[in-house]
């Protein structure tokens, strides 16, 4: 049978999602816990391979197993064998043609900036601290130039392995909740470091170092060297993955927990 799981994790102490030799990853910890429940080796496939330090509230994985277990066992049993910073949120049986990555139609990320002169001791790895005052309205206005299908070479990591820089951004919103600025972006898919590179350049606009139209110009140049530095991994969350309704994938609160859902 094939099982899909919803996964939440604090990526602060992991070297990203993907299993690697000699370092700890989220995938490694999850597979170890699932293998205990299944009493057999389990390999998982995820919707999005997040980088070192990046978090997830809406990650989706699937795996195949011959072990017959109640769905609640894949949740409670796995959680009992996971470290405190990784948790299974739900489990469903899915059809054989479901794939956590290839069946996805969109992914959604939130980047959380703590915009205050002094840093906070609470959630130091859960938000990105930026001490200069930022104009979130200008950041939002600039972000609208990125909507639609475009070549995102200006916001693509140099070592990106994707065959094409073209992506379709469905939604980009920048809002302020007290001292928190939230950059909320959804697209069909993302090139490597795309969200963090976009945020880095939006911060330049928010600080007043660049005009709103600079983002439009950057997009047209298709040159990563002209854009701002990559924003820190802290503060980035994979919050949702969209699938066709026929797969029956549950919808849950986006998070992270300290933000109101939308």
From Swiss-Prot:
Residues of the active site: 51 (nucleophile)
EC number(s) per entry: 5.4.99.12
Record keywords, A-Z: Isomerase, tRNA processing
GO molecular function: RNA binding; tRNA pseudouridine(38-40) synthase activity
GO biological process, one term: tRNA pseudouridine synthesis
Stored InterPro entries: PsdUridine_synth_cat_dom_sf (IPR020103), PsdUridine_synth_TruA (IPR001406), PsdUridine_synth_TruA_a/b_dom (IPR020097), PsdUridine_synth_TruA_C (IPR020095), TruA/RsuA/RluB/E/F_N (IPR020094)
Keyword Plastid among record annotations: no
Binding of substrate, residues: 109
Catalytic activity: uridine(38/39/40) in tRNA = pseudouridine(38/39/40) in tRNA
Coiled-coil region(s): none
Subunit architecture: Homodimer.
Similarity annotation: Belongs to the tRNA pseudouridine synthase TruA family.
Function, in words: Formation of pseudouridine at positions 38, 39 and 40 in the anticodon stem and loop of transfer RNAs.
Record protein name field: tRNA pseudouridine synthase A
Protein source organism: Actinobacillus pleuropneumoniae serotype 3 (strain JL03)
Taxonomic lineage of the native organism: Bacteria, Pseudomonadati, Pseudomonadota, Gammaproteobacteria, Pasteurellales
Gene for this chain: truA
